[in-house]
């Protein structure tokens, strides 16, 4: 490589974000789509809800960005923001669980992998829980389970509909049984919510897997999903080795689940708030004064 080529490559790196396929995050003015490799101006991508304008790929977004898309401006009131995980088992693999918690908290600014609260959607009340995949893969530990259970219980008392935005690798193995029991605890809270004939909707985003899929992600009155989201319990390789069969290429995608009746509707990110508004109105949710949220 000549000196001129070296400077040209160095200059290009300053402007083109190095996008990871796992995070879809870059550090430059331009971002390459991990699906179609189209290069887009970062500000244009953000203004399009972090969806590729060329292929429609829905890049991962964080919990704050989700809330901004769903909730009316300044309407979100967060609950239980002080809850933080501990290390009850003193778990350690290559690194200690305590160190992993600290690293995720420092990297995301979150205490754990979910944000919960009340908000309004076009002036209609909604209890909202948003999982954040950046925090240890969105895994469900005792704090995530407790916060989701509490927001369901609050919604039941206030007669509010619920939306849970799912993005998770499943139960958090570092907490053992304390993690697994959250599946039953959340499901029990949802049953009480359902007994009052209140609306519950999960939104399945990429990826929604493991214990989250096996519990509250599939208990909705209406199950929504983002396009091409990976949704499943066990991984493709595990299933193929168990069944000794080759699975379809689109297996465990939102489109495959819609075709087979596990998902009710696939919603593009730009249409989410409009779709939620229609669903809430159809189910008779009344507008609520901002002061009452």
From Swiss-Prot:
KW Transmembrane (keyword) present: no
CoA carboxyltransferase N-terminal domain sequence ranges: 29-293
Annotated Gene Ontology cellular component terms: acetyl-CoA carboxylase complex
Swiss-Prot/TrEMBL catalytic activity: N(6)-carboxybiotinyl-L-lysyl-[protein] + acetyl-CoA = N(6)-biotinyl-L-lysyl-[protein] + malonyl-CoA
Pfam families registered for this protein in UniProt: Carboxyl_trans (PF01039), Zn_ribbon_ACC (PF17848)
Gene Ontology molecular function, alphabetical: acetyl-CoA carboxylase activity; ATP binding; carboxyl- or carbamoyltransferase activity; zinc ion binding
ZnF C4-type span: 33-55
UniProt GO BP: fatty acid biosynthetic process; malonyl-CoA biosynthetic process
Origin: domain of life: Bacteria
Keyword Zinc: yes
EC number: 2.1.3.15
Chain residues that bind Zn(2+): 33, 36, 52, 55
Record InterPro entries: AcCoA_carboxyl_beta (IPR034733), Acetyl_CoA_COase_Trfase_b_su (IPR000438), ClpP/crotonase-like_dom_sf (IPR029045), COA_CT_N (IPR011762), Znf-ACC (IPR041010)
Protein role: Component of the acetyl coenzyme A carboxylase (ACC) complex. Biotin carboxylase (BC) catalyzes the carboxylation of biotin on its carrier protein (BCCP) and then the CO(2) group is transferred by the transcarboxylase to acetyl-CoA to form malonyl-CoA.
Protein name (Swiss-Prot/TrEMBL): Acetyl-coenzyme A carboxylase carboxyl transferase subunit beta
The organism of origin for this protein: Prochlorococcus marinus (strain MIT 9312)
């Amino acid at each position: 490589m000549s000196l001129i080529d070296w400077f040209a490559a160095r200059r290009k790196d300053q402007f083109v974000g190095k996008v990871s396929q796992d995070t879809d995050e870059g550090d430059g003015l331009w971002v390459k789509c991990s699906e179609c490799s189209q290069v887009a101006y970062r500000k244009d991508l953000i203004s399009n809800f972090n969806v590729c304008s060329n292929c429609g790929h829905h890049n991962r977004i964080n919990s704050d960005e989700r809330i901004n898309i769903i909730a009316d401006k300044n309407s979100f009131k967060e609950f239980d923001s002080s809850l933080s995980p501990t290390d009850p088992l003193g778990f350690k693999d290559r690194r200690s669980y305590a160190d992993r918690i600290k690293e995720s908290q420092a990297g995301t600014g979150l205490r754990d992998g979910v944000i919960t609260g009340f908000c309004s959607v076009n002036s209609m009340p909604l209890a909202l829980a948003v999982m954040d995949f950046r925090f240890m893969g969105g895994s469900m530990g005792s704090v995530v389970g407790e916060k989701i259970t509490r927001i369901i219980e609050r919604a039941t008392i206030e007669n509010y509909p619920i939306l849970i935005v799912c993005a998770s690798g499943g139960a958090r193995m570092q907490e053992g049984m304390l993690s697994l029991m959250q599946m039953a605890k959340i499901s029990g809270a949802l049953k009480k919510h359902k007994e009052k004939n209140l609306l519950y909707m999960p939104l399945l985003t990429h990826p929604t897997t493991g214990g989250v899929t096996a519990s509250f992600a599939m208990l909705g009155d209406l199950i929504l999903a983002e396009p091409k989201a990976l949704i499943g319990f066990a991984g493709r390789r595990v299933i193929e080795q168990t069944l000794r069969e080759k699975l379809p290429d689109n297996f465990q995608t939102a489109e495959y689940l819609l075709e087979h009746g596990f998902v009710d509707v696939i919603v593009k990110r730009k249409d989410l708030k409009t779709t939620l508004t229609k669903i809430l109105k159809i189910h008779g949710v009344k507008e609520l004064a901002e002061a009452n949220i």
